[in-house]
Amino acid sequence: MKRTIFFLMAILLPLGVGAAQTDITFVVAGKTSNHRQQADAEVQVLNYHFFAEIFLQPSGSVNPSSLLTPLAAGVAVPFADSGYAMEMHGGRYATETELEANYPDGDYIFQYRSPSTGSVRQVVTLGNPKSAGSGLPRAPRLFLFQSGKPVASEHIDPRQDLLVKWSEFQEGGADPLEIMDDLLFVIMADCDGVRRAHSGRPYENTPYLTYADKSFVIRAEQLLPENIYQLSVEHAVLDTSREHDVVGFATFASTTFLDIHTAGKAKPGEACRTIRKKFDAGQTVLEGG
């Protein structure tokens, strides 16, 4: 795990208004690879992607907000409000080489104003955490269990809890700066893209997963019979920093998506056997893919 300390003096000296900021939980800029796991457990690449986000506290606000990338030539890209975060998404690419050409390693500068920070510029520096090769972690492979036994993704019993496990997060590790260890995210959405289960995010006063976790339980009450659900597991390597009392993450991440199907007979009007809306655009299949 690579770590970098940004603006040491800003950390050591009084932060003024920034020391009591109450608007932002964290900001993140990252590169990600997205994959789909087939019913036979084969994992295939879908696309490569760049993203940046500003996550808000429950009563937090940020306006305006934009991002300067290494190739921006001074032209900032505005963030869009998703309802729970300010988001900026780059293109989706068929190869990691294309991703790197459009979003190279370097400084990604968040420009934003919030009531508790005022107008600030926050730098998140993306740099390959490995000495050579791809900085992206291996794509996780998902394993499903019910009643202590492996279960196929097409035959999930909605009356039982579903235990989700994944292949080892080999690149994950603890943060020597003790800001945040490398993270894991598990999400399950229904056929309409509504999130029904989430493993949590840091700094939201709820449990969340790190590289050290090995499994996540989806409760039976979150499953309906005769339905299809969209399941994802993300492994995220972090490079942490802190400015203006706001934590910043530079991340290289890999996500695997898997559709799961519940058995049984649904109540009238509750069956849904096909995905009507993807909950995450990372599932996009590129033309020719």
Q: Residues of each region from the PLM?
A:
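Bacterial N-terminal signal peptides
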Residues: 6-14
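Short, compositionally biased P/S/T/A/G/V-rich stretches that sit at domain boundaries
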Residues: 19-46, 124-171, 269-288
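Solvent-exposed N-terminal domain segments of exported/luminal and surface proteins
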Residues: 21-98
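Solvent-exposed loop/turn segments flanking beta-strands in beta-repeat/beta-sandwich domains
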Residues: 55-69, 169-200, 226-230, 242
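Recognizes extended acidic, P/S/T-rich segments that occur
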Residues: 66-94, 182-224
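Ligand-binding face of N-terminal immunoglobulin V-set domains in extracellular IgSF glycoproteins
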Residues: 92-110
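Beta-strand-rich modules
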Residues: 114, 221-244
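Extracellular fibronectin type III
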Residues: 120-122, 238-280
